[in-house]
Amino acid sequence: MNVLMISDVYFPRVNGVSTSIETFRKELSRRGASVTLVAPDYGGHGEEEDIIRIPSKKVMFDPEDRMMSYGAILEQKEELRNRQFDLVHIQTPFVAHYAGVALAKELGLPKIVTYHTFFEEYLYHYIPFLPASWMRALARRFSRTQCNDVDGIVVPSHAMAKTLEQYGIQKPLHLIPTGIPEAMFESGERMAFRDKYGIAHDTPMMLFVGRVAFEKNIEFLLHATDLARRQIPELLLVIAGEGPALRSIEKLACTLRLEKNVRMIGYLDREKGLKDCYSAADLFVFASRTETQGLVLLEAMAAGVPVISTAHMGTKDILKEESGAVVPQDDIGEFAAAIVHMISEVEKRSERALQAHRYARSWSSGAMADKMRNLYKNMKEGSSTGASITVR
């Protein structure tokens, strides 16, 4: 199986899409598939096997991102033709989508897309001068047009599949979440992380991992921390990530006088730093309303960290009773009460940590890669079988 992936984002840009692509590429390679990725050039790349970097420019409203040159992608057409791909897998809806569709047509290949981002609840955060209702309607129309222009759509959750059906998308929907690599189940160095960042060994530490973006609802976590610290003054929330809402979150932390209760540590290396960070945490907290899956929840569970999270969109697929997660209502007071209870009840917290670790095993990246490879095989053979909306 020889697959051409194309994406508007990839490492060093850190986000869930980059993580998903990397995870599937590694697991598919272990299963004998060859995956070539077309992605933006961020500068400073070394030698990269099976990655074609495309000249790109910074995006004005989000300098972390890049816009690839459409023409430069199409210039790769003959080289790509010589590689004899079996299908094109589009990962993002910007230049990558239109170039991916064009390449698939030129090369006579089937084309699928993974719908990673819930744009209906995303776009208006970045174009705030237009009414949110307009932006939601635009996002729906945009998604409907793009998804109906491919041969199949991979979705990471039941909620996202249902949403796309409501948009009027007619093409087959294939439910294949991103799984957790085996390495994420290995223990990190809890005390080494705390020593590095000057966090006392007995400080009750909560953790958020992810892009510091407006749609992540991190301000909710700050307000919950503000309430919870009234009963646990030494409570600490560590935020591991960067993004366009960073200054806004820092300002809110100052307004709430949370300087001693919130620590922003930026992005961490996934191979070592992130693993240690998860191991250092007593709780993982999350309140995003726009996740198509919520992969960081599974990463925390794999590390044996109990989770407190609201349930919206894709996170509902993960936050099952058997996960050991505490799922309060979308209410700051209730969320804060859950934090206080979990921090105070050490034995219950340990039980939920073990439960979470066992549960995460059922989301292995290998099992999900098997599903993806089977889909590729069916698409290559001109079949849309396997399109049922069932995770397991």
Regions from the PLM with identified roles:
Residues 39, 52-53, 136-189:
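Donor nucleotide-sugar binding/catalytic pocket of nucleotide-sugar-dependent glycosyltransferases
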Residues 247-268:
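Nucleotide-activated donor-binding/catalytic signature segment of Leloir-type glycosyltransferases, i.e.
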Residues 267, 276-281:
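Short alpha-helical donor nucleotide-sugar binding micro-motif in glycosyltransferases
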Residues 19, 204-230, 237, 244-250, ...:
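A conserved mid-protein helix/loop that constitutes part of the nucleotide-sugar donor-binding site
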Residues 320-321, 325-332, 341-347:
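Conserved acidic donor-binding segment of nucleotide-sugar-dependent glycosyltransferases
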Residues 289:
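Aromatic "clamp/platform" in nucleotide-sugar-dependent glycosyltransferases that forms part
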Residues 306-309:
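Short hydrophobic beta-strand element within catalytic cores of glycosyltransferases
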Residues 186-199:
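A short helix/loop element that forms part of the nucleotide-sugar donor recognition site in Leloir-type
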